[in-house]
Amino acid sequence: AHVKAGGGRGVGGIISFRPEDLSRTAEENNSICLGCHEKGNRTNWHGSTHDERGLMCSNCHTVMKDVSRKYQLKTAFQPDTCFQCHKNKRAEMWRSSHIPVREGKVVCTDCHNPHGSYSENLLKTATVNEVCWQCHAEKRGPFLWEHPPVTESCLNCHDPHGSNNDFLLKISRPRLCQQCHSGGQHNSNPRNPLVTLYAQGRECQNCHSNHHGSNNPA
């Protein structure tokens, strides 16, 4: 692909390109790639997290080999390229509740732009919620009664890569709810021995099922 793309731009820059030439800095190596690949999702590369940490294009991509179906990645399975550095995220995805990356239903770049972003954590959208709503549109609303932690950030309740609690929750229910809802008219601790007889097997969502937002006051 690179030989064909070279056209009249010179043999030296295309065919004899050695991306990991140790005599050049990461910036100098990357500038060779960015000479052609400077548009699209790469416009925010300069100053991005990966740029600041001295990553080279060749850390993730091959130049002449066809290992992956797209993007000339170093691995056949796109997330494995990310996991070369992000080993903690690979571990999270082996938890009982996890984003279906290892099943092949989602890849890292569905949520992140590794080449740079205006938002935190190289997200493809301005906010975390907008990333989540790409798949979970039914949680977006609008609702007559919004749930403030949800409108603020899905990360208030969820661990997006993996959790040992149902639904990617950060901690188990009802303790998750009790972080904010510690008071109220009714006993907010169904595990209190004094109310076990009446609250056994019950959780907050038995009554408050639409915790992302509701058109009913409760």
Predicted regions and their residues:
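Short sequence/structural segments immediately N-terminal
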Residues: 1-218
